[in-house]
């Protein structure tokens, strides 16, 4: 009789073991599917872990705490970015008109991380701009991209003789082995058109020159030769660490970073743009999130004997949801990322529905007026620093929200209007013939 309960218990154990075995098999299948189809897990993947784009490094450098605050310290040190004061003599004496005012505005709104080699701006007319067209999930532009393009456009307006080189890093996509040539070419053209729509809207004509790495390297022996020599000398360890290249990546994955680096060499363009001699210095303006992509430019400058590039790094824009990473266009979720392809109605809906509010107390209007709004937590307040171009208006909005004089809904509406105004430029612009801007034509 005593053995029966044990026997019964043994049967239960067998049942449990079978159940556990089934669960393990189930989990194994899930894990296998997850590995085979990484895109299916994108919803739970925090922004900043862009595995398919090759941009995994920033997520390990820029830590995001529970409140959504980003710590820039490690990135600033790693990329040699130093703080810039609004009265910096190098900026004030720069021959690039309007640069001091633009940077002062960014500094006052606390959205500029700093710069590297800014002493090269002092009394220097021989500057050219490079903007890299980075591939991601969308042909549409995200707010972080529009913000950078707006800074560049402001400089071009003040300096119509300033040359802007747009480099299309299409070879990066080929190195992943997931796209065919025609797919990448079409994708590049469509995204480039959106970039050009924003930059060329208005009456002023700018000196904009475009090239794609794949096409240029086939047609210009000098480009291919410079990069080939550089690849032989660059530190393999540094290259793989910066771009997080692993043993699983194809050999071609070590190529595209070297082509990106060589784009800062002015002599590369002299044949097509005669004024860009070796005396010129490249200026790159981008989010600090993307600054890892330009670090090899310093290695290339030393090896190939041209001027080291100047970097100006802006802060990272948080996502609408506030606490899960970066408003980065890579593998992002359409419903919480602001894109130029959004119609006015859907753009407003995204902002009103998903942007985190900085309300205090119990969330009622009464408590909001009593305790004021949290301008640090509120996403609309954060975004206004990037999209409101009038400093007085920006300060007024922040002050009123902090005092509870502007509601969460009202500050969201103000932010929506600013973003929509910028996006409308792309949305409402006429089609642009991108081929007109290539300085080396395809036959």
What are these regions (language model features)?
Residues 189, 291-295, 409, 413:
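Short, well-ordered alpha-helical segments
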Residues 178-179, 200-205, 217-218, 273-279, ...:
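Intrinsically disordered, low-complexity coil segments
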Residues 1-139, 159, 281-282, 298-371, ...:
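Non-catalytic terminal extensions that flank enzyme cores
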Residues 39-40, 45-269, 298, 428-431:
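N-terminal Rossmann-like or analogous alpha/beta NTP/dinucleotide-binding catalytic cores
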Residues 207-339, 343, 347, 378:
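Positively charged, phosphate-engaging catalytic surfaces used for nucleic-acid and nucleotide handling
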């Amino acid at each position: 009789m005593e053995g029966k309960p044990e026997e019964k218990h043994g049967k239960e154990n067998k049942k449990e073991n079978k159940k556990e075995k089934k669960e393990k098999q189930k989990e194994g299948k899930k894990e296998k599917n997850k590995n085979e189809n990484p895109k299916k897990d994108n919803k739970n993947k925090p922004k900043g872990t862009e595995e398919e784009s090759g941009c995994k490094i920033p997520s390990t450098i820029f830590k995001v705490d529970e409140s959504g605050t980003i710590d820039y310290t490690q990135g600033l040190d790693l990329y040699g970015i130093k703080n810039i004061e609004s009265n910096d003599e190098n900026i004030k004496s720069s021959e690039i008109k309007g640069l001091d005012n633009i940077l002062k505005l960014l500094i006052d709104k606390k959205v500029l991380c700093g710069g590297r080699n800014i002493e090269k701006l002092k009394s220097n007319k021989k500057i050219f701009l490079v903007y890299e067209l980075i591939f991601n999930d969308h042909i549409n532009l995200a707010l972080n991209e529009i913000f950078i393009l707006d800074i560049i456009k402001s400089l071009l307006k003040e300096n119509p003789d300033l040359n802007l080189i747009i480099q299309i890093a299409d070879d990066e996509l080929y190195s992943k082995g997931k796209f065919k040539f025609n797919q990448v070419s079409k994708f590049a053209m469509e995204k480039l058109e959106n970039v050009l729509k924003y930059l060329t809207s208005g009456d002023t004509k700018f000196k904009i020159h475009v090239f794609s790495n794949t096409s240029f390297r086939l047609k210009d022996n000098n480009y291919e030769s410079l990069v080939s020599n550089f690849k032989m000398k660059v530190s393999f360890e540094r290259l793989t660490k910066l771009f997080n290249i692993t043993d699983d990546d194809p050999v071609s994955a070590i190529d595209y970073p070297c082509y990106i680096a060589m784009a800062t060499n002015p002599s590369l363009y002299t044949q097509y743009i005669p004024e860009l001699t070796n005396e010129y210095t490249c200026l790159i303006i981008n989010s600090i999130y993307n600054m890892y992509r330009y670090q090899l430019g310093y290695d290339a400058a030393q090896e190939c004997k041209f001027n080291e590039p100047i970097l100006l790094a802006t802060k990272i824009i948080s996502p609408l949801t506030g606490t899960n990473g970066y408003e980065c266009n890579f593998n992002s979720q359409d419903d919480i990322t602001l894109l130029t392809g959004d119609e006015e109605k859907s753009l407003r809906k995204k902002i009103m529905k998903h942007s985190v509010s900085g309300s205090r107390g119990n969330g009622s209007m009464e408590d909001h007026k009593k305790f004021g709004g949290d301008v640090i937590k509120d996403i609309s307040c954060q975004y206004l620093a990037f999209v409101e171009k009038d400093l007085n208006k920006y300060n007024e909005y922040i002050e009123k929200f902090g005092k509870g004089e502007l509601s969460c809904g009202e500050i969201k509406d103000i932010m929506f209007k600013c973003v929509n105004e910028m996006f409308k430029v792309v949305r409402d612009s006429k089609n642009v013939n991108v081929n007109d801007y290539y300085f080396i034509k395809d036959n």
